[in-house]
Amino acid sequence: MPEADSGESGQPFILSDRIFVRQREKMIKIYVADILYIEADRNYCRIFSKTHEYLLCITLKAIEEKLDNRIFLRVHRSYIINLSHIDAVAEDHVIINQKAIPVSEGLKEKLLQRIQTL
């Protein structure tokens, strides 16, 4: 089970290619390229990477404001995805790492504009 962020601010520290999140008494480095998607869970967020899951005490909106919008896109009120990890796009969801992530009707057009289609 992932550990909740116990830091004072709860805010991840973000550099251009990595973020640092507080887990217990230490800061853990997560490469931005390894983040698959981020899921909101009330006032918490779960960051899913290729190998781990991290639970942070921060809202999805606060994370969204800090992430590079060229790489990440909010596709639902509860999800932000890393565009480079999309495996498939269906009518109402995207597949990332065998997980179906819902795409809101209002955000679908933005998603389709951001991905290259032939």
Walk through the language-model features, giving the residues of each.
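C-terminal structural segments of small proteins and small subunits
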Residues: 92-95, 102-105, 109
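C-terminal output/interaction extensions
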Residues: 110-118
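Conserved binding/recognition cores within well-folded domains
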Residues: 2-96
